Amino acid sequence: MIVAIEGIVSKKEPTFVVLKTSSGVSYGVYVSLFCSGNFEKDQKIELSITQIIKEDSHKLYGFLDTNEQRMFELLIKISGIGATTAMALCSSLDTNTFYTALQSGDESVFKKVPGIGPKSAKRIIAELSDAKINIENSNQDHAQALAALLSLGFKQENILKVLRTCESQNTSELIKEALKKLA
């Protein structure tokens, strides 16, 4: 099972990249628009990977932001929501908008996404109602870490880029991990 890939971006399309690893192997990885907006061609990056193996295909989906990866993995568990539709949701909604729409039960936010109709929007809200707490806690931890790092004098733009790559789950660990990357 592939969980992460580090390499140079040798090809970049809006929702697909090719990463060439140091061993010379290149991997094709599907990414969201938010993800692809955070790096350039010929840049070295590391993507967390969700690997989906089916009878007729083997696809890799990459994420810089662990919250976006969690969102994708929650969505693909819903009946009728495949990886392509889940990635369309990740490209159209940031995790905060996604959580807010879930919390408020706002189907209209989901229906704006290509491939999501009224039935799918209702299904997303119904099936992910249990997941709301995990998403909320994750967003609160990131918000608290952001506030703490801002108070230390770091620029918000730099902090947000670093927090997207952090894998820690609670505020204090996020701050420690971010400080190592910002220093």
UniProtKB/Swiss-Prot annotation:
Chain ranges passing through the membrane: none
SUPFAM superfamilies cross-referenced by the UniProt entry: DNA helicase RuvA subunit, C-terminal domain (SSF46929), Nucleic acid-binding proteins (SSF50249), RuvA domain 2-like (SSF47781)
A Pfam family per the record: HHH_5
Renumbered residue ranges of the record's region Domain I: 1-64
Any GO MF annotation of the entry: four-way junction helicase activity
Start and end residues of each stretch annotated as Domain II: 65-138
Chief location bin: cytoplasm
Superkingdom of source: Bacteria
Descriptive protein name: Holliday junction branch migration complex subunit RuvA
Organism: Campylobacter lari (strain RM2100 / D67 / ATCC BAA-1060)
Lineage summary: Bacteria, Pseudomonadati, Campylobacterota, Epsilonproteobacteria, Campylobacterales
